[in-house]
């Protein structure tokens, strides 16, 4: 939905802006650490680039679902794991100059096997990637999504601090 904002700034200047208003409650992207040295990635089809992309599990929040519960649900649907330890470590916007959408970065630890049915059209490949090889990962042609790249470095740096 396109929303119009008529604003007056502190200097008296008036402007009209248009922005894309998010339809939902936002989204989560999950940095799931099976141990202190690895992170879980999924390989899934991305229709925008008409190809497969390596990235972190992610998805939209459902109605009446808090961020941590939504992250745990997405983790189970996409990776076949749930987490006993979940916490929000940041918030990312895609284009704050014209979109209201935000993605919340969730760190997931203390993982255990648990699968929920998801909405993906095919089973996703789950890859354990070493945190000390992130530079190699983001130089690949199949790991280009900005939210994933930002969340990977946030999780790696936080994991280093907590050792």
Give the location of each predicted region.
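Acidic, metal-coordinating catalytic segment for phosphate/diphosphate chemistry
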Residues: 1-29, 34-35
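Active-site-adjacent beta-strand/loop module that shapes the phosphate/pyrophosphate-binding cleft
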Residues: 6-11, 95-114, 127
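Short loop segments at secondary-structure junctions
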Residues: 10-11, 34-36, 45, 109-113, ...
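Conserved Nudix-box catalytic region and its N-terminal flanking loop in Nudix hydrolases
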Residues: 20, 29-73, 77, 90
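Nudix hydrolase/Nudix homology domain
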Residues: 52, 97-99, 113, 121-163
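Helix N-cap/coil-helix junction residues
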Residues: 80-81, 143
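A short coil-to-beta-strand element that immediately follows conserved catalytic motifs
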Residues: 82-89
